[in-house]
């Protein structure tokens, strides 16, 4: 028989006050039909692929570290559109609107041929190959070998108006009662800004190798003293404003090429007879006899060295245009603060140049016998970039709800727009001394006007100034022509301002044969 019972679960009531809703930029930004093209110069960098090279005193950096496994973070500075001398002033009303840039197209061009680079360590911590083992070998006091390998293959770029957020695993602070020398420390996930020069994951994970691998021999030279970061796509995709990542493209591949085992004392022993008076005896292994090589069990610290495998031009993310129609977040390509961040990783052009120099006096033609000690070997890595943009001019209405959201997102934007700024009445005349630094005149002012602080001053980026590299002539540039042709657009001039409109293609009339 059915019996009615009162509800035993919790009842959820709506909040008494409305919850703040973040609007998409498409809801309040008005896009115009005015487009600009911007492109950088050929951006080149040269350095050592594994480490920085210093002088003997250590106070001068002679050769910087430039590796194909590093992140390249370009900070593109754009001009303020509100200070443009537009030929057609009817585009916007400065009393009721402000202008901003929107990214509509992007092409990241890369020079240099495809190539595979190798990395390694002259003291790499490996005992032997454990995939095809034909003899049982236990560890000694030093089993390190000179080993090299190719890294995981990765192509990736991330576009936004704020820096890309990365994640890595870091050594955490243990509880007071758990602090014991020689024990494995706790680890925690950290979020940091990906800066120019930060190492990407090459197959050993995203972690701080400087603090978590104190033997300095578990990974290759280029990351043994570094932090390998990986973009935190989950955090950026769930960001309420979506400024760090408008869109991204990613291609990674690897396979395990070699299988090794670590040398050293095992930190976590395999459970055996030492657990609870033999409770775990013979649960994981049966010990070998005293007359066998297996009497002392070997390490179980297995690890692979990965390989990026084939590098091909058929799977390239670069040297091709990308068009932004709809971003993944609420920010649909609006470049707040007139800047754009492009984070790039590409190790498919990872060739390291080997340069040899004759160290003896005399000429090469006088050498009779080759001696390796007469030559000095150097390694160099080069990178070549060029970035092109299609920018759209947009208008923001100065309404209360729009300004409230922008103020909550970034209040410094309203300061740059100088909203409600009324200059104070100027005095009729000012005092100006000619020899202000002489002893006969008063002391000059000690507090010059403060410049606006850069919120990213403590980070390292590849700064590129595009304030004087914008053009309305889209058909004069490769990316501009692609943008016009791919959507069937045509460029017209109205009141001295070039704008884009959708053109119509009419068929050709053919004369009818009688």
From Swiss-Prot:
User: What are the subcellular locations of this protein?
Assistant: Virion; Host nucleus
**Gene Ontology terms: biological process:** endocytosis involved in viral entry into host cell; virion attachment to host cell
- Give the highest taxon in the source lineage: Viruses
Q: What does this protein do?
A: Forms an icosahedral capsid with a T=7 symmetry and a 50 nm diameter. The capsid is composed of 72 pentamers linked to each other by disulfide bonds and associated with L2 proteins. Binds to heparan sulfate proteoglycans on cell surface of basal layer keratinocytes to provide initial virion attachment. This binding mediates a conformational change in the virus capsid that facilitates efficient infection. The virion enters the host cell via endocytosis. During virus trafficking, L1 protein dissociates from the viral DNA and the genomic DNA is released to the host nucleus.
Assembly notes: Self-assembles into homopentamers. The capsid has an icosahedral symmetry and consists of 72 capsomers, with each capsomer being a pentamer of L1. Interacts with the minor capsid protein L2; this interaction is necessary for viral genome encapsidation. Interacts with protein E2; this interaction enhances E2-dependent replication and transcription activation.
Q: Which SUPFAM superfamilies match?
A: Group I dsDNA viruses
- What's this protein's family per the entry? Belongs to the papillomaviridae L1 protein family.
Tell me which Pfam families the record gives. Answer: Late_protein_L1
- Alphabetical UniProt keywords: Capsid protein, Disulfide bond, Host nucleus, Host-virus interaction, Late protein, T=7 icosahedral capsid protein, Viral attachment to host cell, Viral penetration into host cytoplasm, Virion, Virus endocytosis by host, Virus entry into host cell
Concerning Gene3D superfamilies, the annotation shows: Major capsid L1 (late) superfamily, Papillomavirus (2.60.175.20)
Record's Gene Ontology CC terms?
host cell nucleus; T=7 icosahedral viral capsid
* InterPro entries tied to this protein: Capsid_L1_Papillomavir (IPR002210), Capsid_L1_sf_Papillomavir (IPR036973), dsDNA_vir_gr_I_capsid (IPR011222)
Q: Where is this region: Disordered?
A: 127-147
State any single GO MF term: structural molecule activity
The name under which this protein is listed is Major capsid protein L1
Q: Classify the main location.
A: virion
């Amino acid at each position: 028989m059915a019996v009615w019972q009162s509800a035993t679960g919790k009842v959820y009531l709506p909040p008494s006050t409305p919850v703040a809703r973040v609007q998409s930029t498409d809801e309040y930004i008005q896009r115009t039909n005015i487009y600009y093209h911007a492109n950088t110069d050929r951006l080149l960098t040269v350095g050592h692929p594994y480490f920085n090279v210093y002088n003997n005193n250590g106070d001068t950096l002679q050769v910087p570290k430039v590796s194909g496994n590093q992140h390249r973070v370009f900070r593109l500075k754009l001009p303020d559109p509100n200070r443009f001398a537009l030929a057609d002033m009817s585009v916007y009303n400065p009393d009721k609107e402000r202008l901003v840039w929107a990214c509509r197209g992007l092409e990241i061009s890369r020079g240099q041929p495809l190539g595979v680079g190798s990395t390694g360590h002259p003291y790499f911590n490996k005992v032997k190959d454990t995939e095809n083992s034909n003899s049982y070998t236990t560890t000694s006091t030093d089993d390190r070998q000179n080993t090299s390998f190719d890294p995981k293959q990765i192509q990736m770029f991330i576009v936004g108006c704020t820096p890309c957020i990365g994640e890595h695993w870091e050594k955490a602070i243990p509880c007071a009662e758990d602090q014991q020398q020689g024990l494995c420390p706790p680890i925690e996930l950290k979020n940091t800004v990906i800066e120019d020069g930060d190492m990407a994951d090459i197959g050993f994970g995203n972690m701080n190798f400087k603090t978590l691998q104190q033997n300095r021999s578990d990974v290759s030279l280029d990351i043994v003293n570094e932090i390998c970061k990986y973009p935190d796509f989950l955090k950026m995709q769930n960001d309420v404003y979506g400024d760090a990542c408008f869109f991204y493209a990613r291609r990674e591949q690897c396979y395990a090429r070699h299988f090794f085992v670590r040398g050293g004392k095992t930190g976590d022993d395999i459970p055996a007879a030492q657990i609870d008076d033999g409770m775990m005896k013979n649960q994981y292994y049966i010990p070998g006899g005293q007359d066998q090589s297996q009497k002392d069990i070997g390490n179980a610290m297995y690890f692979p060295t990965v390989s990026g495998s084939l590098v091909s031009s058929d799977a390239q993310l670069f040297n091709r245009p990308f068009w932004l129609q709809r971003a993944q977040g609420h920010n649909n390509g609006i470049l707040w603060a007139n800047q754009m961040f492009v984070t790039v990783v590409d190790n498919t052009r990872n060739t390291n140049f080997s340069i040899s120099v004759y160290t003896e006096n005399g000429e090469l033609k006088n050498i009779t016998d080759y001696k390796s000690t007469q030559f000095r070997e150097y390694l160099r890595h080069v990178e070549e970039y060029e970035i092109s943009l299609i920018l759209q001019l947009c208008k923001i209405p100065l309404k209360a709800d729009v300004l409230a959201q922008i103020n909550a997102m970034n209040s410094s934007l309203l300061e740059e727009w100088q909203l409600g700024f009324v200059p104070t009445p100027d005095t009729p005349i000012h005092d100006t001394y000619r020899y202000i630094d002489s002893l006969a005149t008063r002391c000059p002012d000690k507090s010059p006007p403060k410049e606006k602080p850069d919120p990213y001053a403590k980070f390292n980026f590849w700064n590129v100034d595009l304030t004087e590299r914008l053009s309305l002539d889209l058909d004069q540039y490769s990316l501009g022509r692609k943008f016009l042709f791919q959507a069937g657009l045509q460029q017209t001039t109205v009141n001295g301002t070039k704008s884009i409109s959708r053109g119509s293609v009419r068929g050709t009339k053919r004369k009818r044969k009688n």
